Amino acid sequence: EVMFFVAFFWAFFDASLTPKLPIEEFAETFDSNGAVGVWPPEGIKTFDPLDIPFLNTLILLMSGTTCTWAHHAVREGHRDQAIQALWLTVGLGVCFTLLQAFEYYEAVHHYFKFTDGIYPSVFYMATGFHGFHVMVGTIFLGVCLFRVYKNHMTPDRHFGLEAAAWYWHFVDVVWLFLYVCVYIWGA
């Protein structure tokens, strides 16, 4: 999983740190210093990092907090708190996914399509793969919520929730890197 995201970050940084000109322009503008393009490529309108991406960042950070709350509540034997915290975490995961879907809708209709070059390709693949991980994590936490309801988790036996929490925090950290690199620095 980590290496998959490393590949996307690598592609993003390779393309953004040494932007290439389209082949048509390359032949016309080549000189002894070499041709260098701009980043993001001309014609690509990027998202305002303080709009939907920032809201999604806040949502994931809050969900990381509620996930940790759920884990500690189970460890302390506070079942009702764990249920409440897991409901909040799952709800925040669903909110993130819906906002990401809305962002994709906006991107396709107002910003860029997948086929518009390297920036959209890496953007859609990296954020889409992350979004897939959020959906998997939301389902994972939903199963944990069901198991807490059924009293399957105790202070001594809660590995499923602990694994889900580790997974969820991985998803949080990846998003922070995506937010900083793609939305802030990449724009």
Locate predicted features:
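...captures the hydrophobic TM-helix bundle architecture rather than a specific catalytic motif
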Residues: V2-A187
